């Protein structure tokens, strides 16, 4: 199945980041917090304004981003894999 986000929506796949405790122990499962990094796999056409103009998004497919996992982030299972659908406003930074 292919997803095509609308307007300023972005679809990303969460990147798992190895989490270590202060003592160097690798944390897994419930002891590890979910990563707020993801790889952009699809972007919408842009932010639509009331006057009808469209502003292109700052992120593109392939970008690795840090996002704010809050109220506006929607998690979906597509073909057995979790993807996140969020507004570009929920993206805090692009990792370069």
Swiss-Prot record:
Keyword ATP-binding applies: no
Ranges in coiled-coil conformation: none
PANTHER family from the UniProt entry: 10 KDA HEAT SHOCK PROTEIN, CO-CHAPERONIN GROES
Intracellular or extracellular location(s): Cytoplasm
Record-stated family: Belongs to the GroES chaperonin family.
Protein origin, superkingdom: Bacteria
Protein name, per record: Co-chaperonin GroES
PROSITE patterns (alphabetical): CHAPERONINS_CPN10 (PS00681)
Alphabetized UniProt keyword annotations: Chaperone, Cytoplasm
UniProt cross-references to Pfam families, sorted A to Z: Cpn10 (PF00166)
Subunit annotation: Heptamer of 7 subunits arranged in a ring. Interacts with the chaperonin GroEL.
GO cellular component: cytoplasm
GO terms assigned for molecular function: ATP binding; metal ion binding; protein folding chaperone; protein-folding chaperone binding; unfolded protein binding
Function statement: Together with the chaperonin GroEL, plays an essential role in assisting protein folding. The GroEL-GroES system forms a nano-cage that allows encapsulation of the non-native substrate proteins and provides a physical environment optimized to promote and accelerate protein folding. GroES binds to the apical surface of the GroEL ring, thereby capping the opening of the GroEL channel.
Keyword Chaperone: yes
GO BP terms, alphabetized: chaperone cofactor-dependent protein refolding
């Amino acid at each position: 199945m292919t997803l095509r986000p609308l307007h300023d929506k972005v679809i990303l796949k969460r990147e798992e980041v190895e989490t270590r405790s202060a003592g160097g122990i690798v944390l897994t499962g419930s002891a590890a917090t979910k990563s707020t990094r993801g790889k952009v796999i699809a972007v919408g056409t842009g932010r639509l304004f009331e006057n009808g103009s469209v502003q292109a998004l700052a992120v593109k497919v392939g970008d690795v981003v840090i996002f704010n996992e809050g109220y506006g982030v929607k998690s979906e299972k597509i073909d057995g894999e979790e993807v996140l659908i969020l507004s570009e406003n929920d993206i805090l930074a692009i990792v370069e």
